[in-house]
Design a protein with these regions (language model features):
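ATP-dependent carboxylate activation and anion-phosphoryl transfer catalytic cores
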Residues: 91-145
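Short small-residue beta-strand/loop micro-motif enriched in glycine and branched aliphatics
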Residues: 2, 83-86, 140-142
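Phosphate-binding site of ATP-dependent enzymes
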Residues: 12-92, 99, 120-127
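Gly/Ser/Thr-rich beta-alpha loop segments that engage phosphate groups in nucleotides
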Residues: 4, 40, 137-138
Length: 145
């Protein structure tokens, strides 16, 4: 909600303008966070019926860069189907993303299935963005396998 090209700010004037817009137009408070310019992932979490273990299925989400060179999944990008979804290659990065997703899911009390969104900084350090413990299962809009 309210995420657009003006969401990444570089000074207090831009910050004040964006926060005021959110308050005035959407009647919501602003959550201000550091912009993470690395890759973004959506990780489906499923509990195996056979083993009972949690399994993680990450996909990488990317979108066209805006005029400032930032990439974000804004409402406009999603509504125009401009995001790209690709599999995550095997390796340490995938293992790290899957571990963070499963740990986050457990910490939030997730039981059977859910989706965890993660974004990395420039150095590749992964950060929890949000959880959807009742994710949409519609393939086109749900980012769930």
């Amino acid at each position: 909600m309210g995420i657009d090209e003006a969401s990444v700010v570089h000074n207090s004037f831009q910050l004040d303008r964006k926060v005021s817009m959110l308050k005035t137009e959407l009647n919501v408070d602003a959550l201000v966070e550091q912009y993470l310019s690395g890759k973004e992932y959506s990780v489906a979490i499923l509990r195996s019926l056979k083993t009972g273990e949690l399994q993680a299925y990450p996909i990488e989400l990317s979108s066209p860069k805006d005029s400032d060179g930032n990439s974000m999944l804004s409402k406009s990008v999603k509504s125009n189907d401009a995001e790209y979804v690709s599999p995550v290659k095997l390796g340490k990065a995938k293992d790290k993303i899957c571990k963070l997703a499963i740990d986050s899911f457990k910490a939030l009390g997730g039981k059977s299935y859910g989706r965890i969104d993660i974004r990395c900084n420039d150095e590749g350090k992964a950060y929890f963005l949000e959880a959807n413990l009742i994710p949409g299962l519609i393939q086109k809009t749900g980012y769930f396998p």
